[in-house]
Amino acid sequence: RDDLPEPQALRSVNGVLELHLNVGYASMDMDLPDSDIARWARYPADRQPGRRLELRSFNGRYTAPTLWLRPGDTLKMWVHNQLPASPQGSDWALLNHQNSTNMHFHGLHVDPREIRPGVFGDYVVDGPDAGIAPGATRYHEIHLPDDHSCGIYWYHPHLHGATNAQVSSGMFGAIIVADAQDPFRASVNMRERVLFAHKLTVNAKGRTDTLEDSMQNPAGAFLLNGAYQPTIVMRPGEVQHWHIVNPSSFYPL
């Protein structure tokens, strides 16, 4: 049985894709390996079924929607930060803003400025004490040039001092810029799938409250679309097109 989770897919309509992303904590039940040793020593490892985690998220989900765009399209995105006030106590001031955020459209060749008052492009120059604070909203308007390269890109927070804790929680999504006239897509009847190979790291309480939680704790696992060791089923002769993203902080594939 194929049990690989599929991120929600959204497609542009008449050249426009509109999306509201609510940033907040979400309770998620996830199967994780029973120990750090088990993860490396054997396959498949024993699992802790349905472990309850509290993770920062977009719209209450692990991984954000996959956005399907075409060259010339416009993406309109509202990011609503509904997180509580940031935890304090770090000796480094830049690490006391873990619940402020922003948005980076990774790899897109688009305007990086504040395009006009209150309308932002791929704007990631916020200092740690700026960005989208808890309770605030930011509107992004991303216009793809008509000659924009097709391929897979991704979007994620990029606020210095807070990025790792948020991306480690699953705050990321794919952007696929596709050409409807692509002869490869037109010539093969195939299933297209997005695969996030991601290292989830949480503390003993199942949270990623601080930078240290997202870097130094062994309680976690490598996941594929939020699932631990899922099964992918293919028929003989079947063709699938896999779009693979590694949103982990330190781990190459």
Name what the model sees in each region.
Residues R1-L253:
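Histidine-centered copper-binding motifs that mark active-site loops
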